[in-house]
Amino acid sequence: MAERTYRINIAAELAGVRVELIRAWERRYGVLTPRRTPAGYRAYTDRDVAVLKQLKRLTDEGVAISEAAKLLPQLMEGLEAEVAGRGASQDARPHAETWRESMLAATQAYDQPRVSDVLDEVLAALPPLKAFDEVLAPLLCDVGERWESGTLTVAQEHLVSQMVRARLVSLLHAAPLGRHRHGVLACFPEEEHEMGLLGAALRLRHLGVRVTLLGQRVPAEDLGRAVLALRPDFVGLSTVASRSAEDFEDTLTRLRQALPRGLPVWVGGAAARSHQAVCERLAVHVFQGEEDWDRLAGT
C-alpha cells in the first residue's frame, strides 16, 4: 500500500504548526526534507507529521528549535520504535467504538488536541475506507445527533467536524486518481453539509473512479456548466438538511434541468431518502447501499 502523504497546509494542520514555521525550520535547521510531487509540491508523510508534533512539543516546553533539531536522531529512533510496536500490537488496538467514545469525550471537554491525536491513531491503524466506515462516519452521526438533542453546542460540533474534514481531505489527496469512469460530485445549492460527499468521493476513488469534487452549495447553473465542460459518466448529489417535499422537488427539478438529458444522476443523504418518490418521478437514482457503489464504478 502506498504511503499516505499530505500537502504542507494539511501537514501543518495535523501537526498544529504554522506553514511559515515549517518552512523556516526546514530552511534554517534541516529538520525535514520532504519529497516533492511531480508538480513540485512538498509531500509530507505520517512520520514527517509525527516529527513536527515532537518538535512543537519541545518548543512549547521552552526548548529552542536549534536545540530541538539536534535531538532529531533520538526522535526518529523513538518514532521507528513506535511504528514497530504498533505493528506488533495491532490485535490489541482499541475497537472503533472506543475511539469514537474517546473523541466524543474530548469534544465535550473542548480538547481539540486529544481529538486530533485519536484521529491520527485511527488513520495509522486502519485503511482509509475502514477508518471512514467504522469510525469517522459514525462519529459524525453521533456528533450530529448530540447537537440536535442539545448535548453538544455548535462550537463543539465545529471543533470535531473541522478536524474530521481535514483528515478526509488528506485521505482524498492520497487516494488513487482513477482512470476509467468519471463522476462529478456536488452538494445541493443550499447544502452546507459535505462530509458524506467527501466520504463518497473517497470510496469512488478507491474503486477506480475519477472524481471531480465541487463541494458545498453548488448552484444548478454552475453545476450544469461544469458538467457540459467535463462530460462525466454520472453526477452524484448530496442533500442532508431537512426540507419540505415541495422545496426538495423544486431544487431537484432545477438541478435535473441544468444537466444533459440522459446523463445518470444519483442523489444521496437523509433528505433524498425522505423524498424517494420525488426522485423516482424525476428519473433520479437514490443511493441505497453497497450494490450502488458497484453500479457507479461500472463493476
From Swiss-Prot:
B12-binding domain boundaries: 180-299
Gene Ontology BP annotations: carotenoid biosynthetic process
GO molecular function, one term: DNA binding
Outcome of mutating residue 42 to A: Lack of activity, even in the presence of cobalamin. Retains the ability to interact with CarS
Keywords, alphabetical: Carotenoid biosynthesis, DNA-binding, Repressor, Transcription, Transcription regulation
Keyword Repressor: yes
Domain HTH merR-type, residue spans: 5-74
Regulation of this protein's activity per its record: Requires cobalamin (vitamin B12) for repressor activity. In the dark, binding of cobalamin to CarH induces its oligomerization, which enhances binding to the DNA and repressor activity. Light causes cobalamin photolysis and disruption of the cobalamin-CarH complex, which decreases interaction with DNA and allows transcription of the carB operon. Interaction with CarS also prevents binding to DNA.
Residue ranges of DNA binding: 8-27
Gene3D superfamilies for the chain: 1.10.1660.10, Cobalamin-binding domain, Methionine synthase domain
Note on domains (UniProt): The N-terminal region interacts with DNA and CarS, and the C-terminal region is involved in oligomerization and binding of cobalamin.
Family statement: Belongs to the CarA/CarH B12-binding photoregulator family.
Subunit (UniProt): Forms oligomers. Interacts with CarS.
Entry function: Negative regulator of the carB operon in the dark. Binds specifically to the CarA operator, in the region around the carB promoter, which blocks access to the RNA polymerase.
Identification of the protein by name: HTH-type transcriptional repressor CarH
